[in-house]
Amino acid sequence: MSSYGRLDEHEQAKLEASRKTKKRIAIIAISSIVLVCIVVGAVVGTTARDNSKKPPTENNGEPISVSVKALCDVTLHKEKCFETLGSAPNASRSSPEELFKYAVKVTITELSKVLDGFSNGEHMDNATSAAMGACVELIGLAVDQLNETMTSSLKNFDDLRTWLSSVGTYQETCMDALVEANKPSLTTFGENHLKNSTEMTSNALAIITWLGKIADTVKFRRRRLLETGNAKVVVADLPMMEGRRLLESGDLKKKATIVVAKDGSGKYRTIGEALAEVEEKNEKPTIIYVKKGVYLENVRVEKTKWNVVMVGDGQSKTIVSAGLNFIDGTPTFETATFAVFGKGFMARDMGFINTAGPAKHQAVALMVSADLSVFYKCTMDAFQDTMYAHAQRQFYRDCVILGTVDFIFGNAAVVFQKCEILPRRPMKGQQNTITAQGRKDPNQNTGISIHNCTIKPLDNLTDIQTFLGRPWKDFSTTVIMKSFMDKFINPKGWLPWTGDTAPDTIFYAEYLNSGPGASTKNRVKWQGLKTSLTKKEANKFTVKPFIDGNNWLPATKVPFNSDF
């Protein structure tokens, strides 16, 4: 039976604290609503002043709502945005969240049509068939990612931006594969098929980026502590993070539930067989111990294989080796010796080699398109396109990366920390370029961050021109900071992709690097190259803000520096 007496001092204090907390949350929520109204009003007011044409209308002839106008104004493809959101049911009465979800929904529908178009080809030659096959896989990845986006909370702004950035990357990679086939008609086919879905994806990304900035302004972003004593941090994918805590103690080899050994002393002799046993979409880690040996196989960690932890006997002892390459007819995206798509993947003490050699051009050793992935004390060994950091959030610590042309490339949000980056001797007539970052859209939260690494030659490269990188796409983003550069780096530092300059829209930066190759005195004079960042600007590319690492790396027990 309840007692209805006077509260003691302790209970009274708890009640008062609870009231203050609720009041604080209410103030924040009201502030958020007020700010959204102010910003929407400002945007719409600006649009009205700048637009002398008749206002766009919904399908039923009614004027487009204030929310639709505000959201479409921040997009890169406004006409497509008005067309898309204007067709939303009850668009004039829909909230920004509902309109965003609708934008994602119609993008899924459009990409499903695109997938059908790539799946129905007949009588194709080998190059066309290979490129179309790559597109089928990539568009499938995009659809899956958008479906996950549909079920996520709108407050998960970092996650949503990452996932929508990856959806754009998947479509761009499909286009790259079609261009690689070197058939103008195939390129035109791809451009026509992908135009609508690419614009829709870009618009959804722009909308969530803008909404995230509003939330940031009022400190209402997820994972932030409320100023209360009993507040908890909300982290990305909490069940997965909790599961990873199984890694916190003990020898991972002894914890392994699956053992692979060339000599037959394990359950399996190949890594592929071991992965087939892994439970799909498991929130807890599946630890696979791969004993020393050279495993001659192309390995794929599929998108449904979550939280796989693979441990070897050493980066020069447990080696995965294969030789797929572009010259022999495989699209770059599918040449990887080891390819990872399942989120939460971790590898340590392993080596990944593509043996194709420099004459075979693009030949990837490791390709990663898995969110929240980690590589610790691993070696990636090839020539052109060694390390394909394709998409999502990734972290590499104490790794060794060898290569020649564009050998760290892709469009992930990726941090390389305390790694050795070793350019090697290329083919005759070639020059070395370490990075080729593939950011295509200004709203993508992607880029390559090289932090506290060592850049030195593997071979004698005194007669070889070696550059820090070249901009693969229009918004290419690469930052090298607090790293050692040996004297073999060309004083110009960076190389254009084509012509004699780079797009003004790139973001390249060097910050507090050391060594005889680190001087920025004679660097190229590009508008997009920054050689005098402030500490605050450079810090944006460290683990904590750039890949949200403080929320998911601690559970892996891999050492990392969250900032400077």
Swiss-Prot record:
Pathway(s) served: Glycan metabolism; pectin degradation; 2-dehydro-3-deoxy-D-gluconate from pectin: step 1/5
Site residues (Transition state stabilizer), renumbered to this chain: Q384
Transmembrane in keyword set: yes
Coiled coil: none
Top-rank taxon: Eukaryota
Location of the region described as Pectinesterase inhibitor 46 in the Swiss-Prot/TrEMBL record: 62-207
Membrane-spanning ranges: 25-45
Membrane topology: Single-pass membrane protein
Compartment(s) where it occurs, according to its Swiss-Prot or TrEMBL record: Membrane
Name of the protein described by the UniProt record: Probable pectinesterase/pectinesterase inhibitor 46
Organism: Arabidopsis thaliana (Mouse-ear cress)
